[in-house]
Amino acid sequence: MIIIKNDTEIEYMRQAGKIVGETLNMLEKAAKPGVTTADLDRLAEDFIKKYNAIPSFKGYGGFPASICTSINEEVIHGIPSKHRVLHEGDIISVDCGAILNGYQGDAARTFAIGEISEEAAKLIKVTKESFFKGVEKAVIGNRLTDISHSIQEYVESFGYGVVRDYVGHGIGKEMHEDPEVPNYGRPGRGPKLVHGMVLAIEPMVDVGTYMVKTQSNDWTVVTQDGSLAAHYENTVAILDNGPEILTLCE
């Protein structure tokens, strides 16, 4: 069941989203060669708690950290570790969530570590742009898969693959609510978008095939062919005057 949010609930989510967006902005500056993913996790947890919010990932389904840190061919759900050191030329996707006043914010970014290849930079750019292509369709009266199709069409125009095994989702009091928000599919399908829907829209894109697999830790998802992957996500409210991105602080 899709849970429609009232204006008060959306304001709570706006506040939670601001903390998530600012956390990611802080982490982008901190993500440099020589830093470990555990360092980033500690910074994120401290930052979120400073604003009296709760890191929503920590303990979720047994996940051991406050952020997901996925490097290069890792797509999502990478576990921070003191043994994972960032190196010049890496790319890292950081997924972050926070709870404030009982409501969630969820977002992800992919960062460059020092100087990166042209291919990696293009992948990050296209993944981010595909999110905004999807958001253009996140308007009242459209169907859910209008978002999905717009993302897929844009990504595939560059020859990249759109991950299909993992999708975006509704969000509110719970991190994962209905509906699922695929990043692929035919337009004009799924529920009609209405005022008060809040969605986590999150294209996951790789340079090669869209096929992925899960590593032996049962969390980290990687590309099957070892190609680079990127992830970009925001929490988006569907409002009468158009979509509002709740986790974007630029």
From Swiss-Prot:
GO CC annotation: cytosol
The protein's required cofactors: Co(2+); Zn(2+); Mn(2+); Fe(2+)
Organism listed in the record: Clostridium acetobutylicum (strain ATCC 824 / DSM 792 / JCM 1419 / IAM 19013 / LMG 5710 / NBRC 13948 / NRRL B-527 / VKM B-1787 / 2291 / W)
Superkingdom, taxonomy of origin: Bacteria
Keyword Protease on entry: yes
Transmembrane segments: none
GO biological processes: proteolysis
Name the record gives this protein: Methionine aminopeptidase
NCBIfam families the record matches: met_pdase_I
Gene of this entry: map
GO molecular function: initiator methionyl aminopeptidase activity; metal ion binding; metalloaminopeptidase activity
Complexes and interactors: Monomer.
Cofactor note (record): Binds 2 divalent metal cations per subunit. Has a high-affinity and a low affinity metal-binding site. The true nature of the physiological cofactor is under debate. The enzyme is active with cobalt, zinc, manganese or divalent iron ions. Most likely, methionine aminopeptidases function as mononuclear Fe(2+)-metalloproteases under physiological conditions, and the catalytically relevant metal-binding site has been assigned to the histidine-containing high-affinity site.
Binding residues annotated for substrate, in chain numbering: H77, H176
Protein family: Belongs to the peptidase M24A family. Methionine aminopeptidase type 1 subfamily.
Record-linked CDD domains: MetAP1
Catalysed reactions, semicolon-separated: Release of N-terminal amino acids, preferentially methionine, from peptides and arylamides
